[in-house]
Swiss-Prot record:
The lineage of its organism: Bacteria, Pseudomonadati, Spirochaetota, Spirochaetia, Leptospirales. It is an enzyme of class 2 (transferase). Catalyzes the phosphorylation of the 3'-hydroxyl group of dephosphocoenzyme A to form coenzyme A. Keywords: ATP-binding, Coenzyme A biosynthesis, Cytoplasm, Kinase, Nucleotide-binding, Transferase. Belongs to the CoaE family. This is Dephospho-CoA kinase. The gene is coaE. PROSITE patterns: DPCK (PS51219).
Amino acid sequence: MQNSDSGKKTFLIGITGMIGGGKSTATKILEEMGCFGINADRLAKRYTEPDSPILIELVELLGSEILDEQGKPDRKKISEIVFNNPKKLSRLNQLIHPLVRKDFQKILETTAKGKMVIWEVPLLFETDAYTLCDATVTVDSDPEESILRTISRDKVKKEDVLARIKNQLPLTEKLKRADYILRNRGNIDSLREECKSLYSTLLGKML
């Protein structure tokens, strides 16, 4: 990805995987090695926070039941609705994704300019996000362990996790589409070694 105004090259790496598969951990490790991390979910989160700038649109789309007693959006209620209703999830994505993309582009043009950027995107291949990347990475993890990690981390039921997974491509398909694969089927040290090898490879392509 070329920044035409300065000539400095920003190398954009999209990273994905299944929910609870270790995307964030891998991203953090790569940040420690020198990458600039951008988390798509964190960018999107501000639009479903209590001070959401699109509150009216959210209520029109999902109904007033998403509001708490103070009239603020409840992210848990939003998740329960959209992950069990593919049509509403699609419409929510259509509402939020352009806003997130705009925020993302602003970061690329300012603080991330000229750097190796690791962009954590759960729906990397389900959307056109992968087309913006210089390289794509899928984290390969044990599905059952990933589900258990998500249940523990998010304090949700297994059926809620399975509902989220249903709205994503299968891990096998994400692995097929990726330029690189990070194996996360061991301990943190083995994942760190995988990241170290990947970083070295990608650094060579950036220079």
